[in-house]
């Protein structure tokens, strides 16, 4: 089966703790804290500076993105990504482990996992349970900054894992791909607002199916088993044997869909990078669906 040859998308806290204890963090193994929080809530970089997994570097998703785009969190260029992660000591031969400090156990880490994959890097994993469970289990932390020796990372964009506005618009006619939206149900339906969004009504792309990403996580913040993940997709009539595009608001939690499908043996889920924040501003009104007070979004 295909999932038997896929690189492990998850590593356990126990595995990472043992790897750190045995001195494996270095050019062949790098750890990244990819935390990000809504403005006015928590300060990701400050929290990293106060405590983080020993040897971890801070991956600033605000810096490693296309800052010229009017849309949120769009992918950087190949050169930008390669330079950014190279400065974190990551080469094309490095195993990268990503975590974040979100209370859910995982929020932004799957986005960075997907970013590495979309830029051609196979050996990347998410820390299952995140920093939340690293702390809960009593593993070591440090405030000591990580200063890895810079490395060379050649990024090669894998366009099959990325979808553009034009491709999603065309898909409304061709229906070659299933379209799955990972946001909370109220935001998908248009009955709850998009948080911290100015000029962005909630709602969804016509024809998309709602599978909230939090369904993939246990109450303790771990990824559910492949069997449980398959059942979630099946319950929403999402066929993992067929092509699939993941979307959300800004291309972040959509990566949870890509990760969950990967754990079920499906590595080819594409993410619509602009997601709802782009669709709302560019798409024809009849392709935007909302149950909110204004009808169409």
From Swiss-Prot:
Transmembrane feature ranges: none
Reactions catalysed according to its record: thiosulfate + hydrogen cyanide = thiocyanate + sulfite + 2 H(+)
Assigned EC number: 2.8.1.1
Keyword check for Membrane: no
Glycan-modified residues: 35
Phosphoserine, modified sites: 38
N6-acetyllysine: modified positions: 14, 136, 163, 175, 224, 236-237
Keywords: Acetylation, Glycoprotein, Mitochondrion, Phosphoprotein, Repeat, RNA-binding, Transferase
Phylogenetic placement of the source organism: Eukaryota, Metazoa, Chordata, Craniata, Vertebrata
Record: residues binding substrate: 187, 250
Region Hinge, residue ranges: 144-159
Protein name: Thiosulfate sulfurtransferase
InterPro entries according to UniProt: Rhodanese-like_dom (IPR001763), Rhodanese-like_dom_sf (IPR036873), Thiosulphate_STrfase_CS (IPR001307), TST/MPST-like (IPR045078)
Tissue: Expressed in numerous tissues.
GO cellular component: mitochondrial matrix; mitochondrion
Domain remark text: Contains two rhodanese domains with different primary structures but with near identical secondary structure conformations suggesting a common evolutionary origin. Only the C-terminal rhodanese domain contains the catalytic cysteine residue.
């Amino acid at each position: 089966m295909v999932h038997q040859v896929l690189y492990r998308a998850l590593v356990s806290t126990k595995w990472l703790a043992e790897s750190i204890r045995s001195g494996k963090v270095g050019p062949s193994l790098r750890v990244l804290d990819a935390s990000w929080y809504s403005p006015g809530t928590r300060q990701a970089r400050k929290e990293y500076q106060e405590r983080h997994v020993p040897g971890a570097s801070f991956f600033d998703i605000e810096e490693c993105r296309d800052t010229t785009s009017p849309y949120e969190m769009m992918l950087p260029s190949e050169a930008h990504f390669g330079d950014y992660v190279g400065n974190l000591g990551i080469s094309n031969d490095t195993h990268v482990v990503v975590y974040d400090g979100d209370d859910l156990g995982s929020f932004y880490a799957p986005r960075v996992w997907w970013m590495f994959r979309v830029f051609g890097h196979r050996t990347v994993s998410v820390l299952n349970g995140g920093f939340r469970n690293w702390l809960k289990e009593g593993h070591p932390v440090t405030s000591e900054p990580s200063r890895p020796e810079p490395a060379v990372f050649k990024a090669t964009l894998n366009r099959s894992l990325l979808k553009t506005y034009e491709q999603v618009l065309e898909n409304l006619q061709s229906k070659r791909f299933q379209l799955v939206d990972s946001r909370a149900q109220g935001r998908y339906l248009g009955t709850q607002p998009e948080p911290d969004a100015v000029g962005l009504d909630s709602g969804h792309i016509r024809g998309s199916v709602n599978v909230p990403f939090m369904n993939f996580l246990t109450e303790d913040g771990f990824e559910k088993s492949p069997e449980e993940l398959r059942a979630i997709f099946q319950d929403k009539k999402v066929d993992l044997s067929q092509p699939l595009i993941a979307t959300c608001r800004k291309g972040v939690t959509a990566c949870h869909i890509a990760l969950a499908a990967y754990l079920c043996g499906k590595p080819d889920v594409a993410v619509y990078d602009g997601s709802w924040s782009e669709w709302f501003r560019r798409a024809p009104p009849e392709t935007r669906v909302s149950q909110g007070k204004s009808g169409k979004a």
